[in-house]
Amino acid sequence: MIIDTTEIETINSFSKLESLKEVYGIIWMLVPILTLVLGITIGVLVIVWLEREISAGIQQRIGPEYAGPLGILQALADGTKLLFKENLIPSTGDPRLFSIGPSIAVISIFLSYSVIPFGDHLVLADLSIGVFLWIAISSVAPVGLLMSGYGSNNKYSFLGGLRAAAQSISYEIPLALCVLSISLLSNSSSTVDIVEAQSKYGFLGWNLWRQPIGFIVFLISSLAECERLPFDLPEAEEELVAGYQTEYSGIKFGLFYIASYLNLLVSSLFVTVLYLGGWNLSIPYIFVPELFGINKRGKVFGTLIGIFITLAKTYLFLFIPIATRWTLPRLRMDQLLNLGWKFLLPISLGNLLLTTSSQLLSL
């Protein structure tokens, strides 16, 4: 039997080519994910710097100024310091729950970014249930906080975890009802479709003007979900030392620190997408590339402008939660629960009823 070596070489080269295609396919699939993670990380560093500068301005003092120009690298310096600190585990706690809790809190928030459109056709996963996927994923984060509080075997930590779970349940429902009203108004639950539905009449087409009640409820509920003042009861320093973070140190404490700012950024991005027109320039009858005198070949420039508009709206909105931190006093736990169940829930239900009625009458 004579074996043709050329055929064997052809088969081997073909198999190598197929394996290379698979490797390139995996790499190409990971590129947008890694790009999104890098962008989110830079965005969080910018938020930390902005909060410190705005807080310093409100308190009439000088903010960070030594780590980099204008103190822009201060957050990076703090993160590096936490990396080199020792990770302590309570001797009487549950080490598995203690270690898994911070990871669940961070990963669940990271997944929420997958459905956020940063520009036209610039979204990691354009799903038909995008906004409700965010609601579902954000409900997982308090489970990690409760696990952290229970695994610490500390009364302050456990009470902080219970507060985080109760607060999340109380404000998740009004938040979901506001999102449902937006979905009914836009006839879609896709984040991309919701942005495009607001693009017809410039800034007059924003859902902010069509859903003012829902916007206020969404704003208050998102602040409570982010555990920002005046809703920071799960980690109230005067009562619970640091809440569920009391026993944490090093990188695990840093994960909670990152999670709080990740949650703040994702909430602001969803406010931009749901109520402020997303990536649209919001000037009627003007398309971004045409405004800057470029033709359809300038899609890259148009995409960059869309990203810039989205981030500009997001960071301008961030002034509200940062200012409320130094303006409003902390609520009591009974006041927080009463606000969620007795005020925001009926108001959001009434807003949903009004939206449904208006949509039925317009048919």
Curated annotation (Swiss-Prot):
It is an enzyme of class 7 (translocase). GO terms for cellular component: chloroplast thylakoid membrane. It is a multi-pass membrane protein. GO terms for molecular function: NADH dehydrogenase activity; oxidoreductase activity, acting on NAD(P)H, quinone or similar compound as acceptor; quinone binding. Pfam families: NADHdh. GO terms for biological process: aerobic respiration; photosynthesis, light reaction. It catalyses: a plastoquinone + NADH + (n+1) H(+)(in) = a plastoquinol + NAD(+) + n H(+)(out); a plastoquinone + NADPH + (n+1) H(+)(in) = a plastoquinol + NADP(+) + n H(+)(out). The chain crosses the membrane at residues 30-50, 98-118, 127-147, 165-185, 248-268, 269-289, 300-320, 336-356. Its EC number is 7.1.1.-. InterPro entries: NADH_UbQ_OxRdtase_su1/FPO, NADH_UbQ_OxRdtase_su1_CS. It is found in: Plastid, Chloroplast thylakoid membrane. Keywords: Chloroplast, Membrane, NAD, NADP, Plastid, Plastoquinone, Quinone, Thylakoid, Translocase, Transmembrane, Transmembrane helix. NCBIfam families: PRK06076.1-2 (NF004741). Belongs to the complex I subunit 1 family. NDH is composed of at least 16 different subunits, 5 of which are encoded in the nucleus. NDH shuttles electrons from NAD(P)H:plastoquinone, via FMN and iron-sulfur (Fe-S) centers, to quinones in the photosynthetic chain and possibly in a chloroplast respiratory chain. The immediate electron acceptor for the enzyme in this species is believed to be plastoquinone. Couples the redox reaction to proton translocation, and thus conserves the redox energy in a proton gradient. This is NAD(P)H-quinone oxidoreductase subunit 1, chloroplastic. It comes from Atropa belladonna (Belladonna). The gene is ndhA.
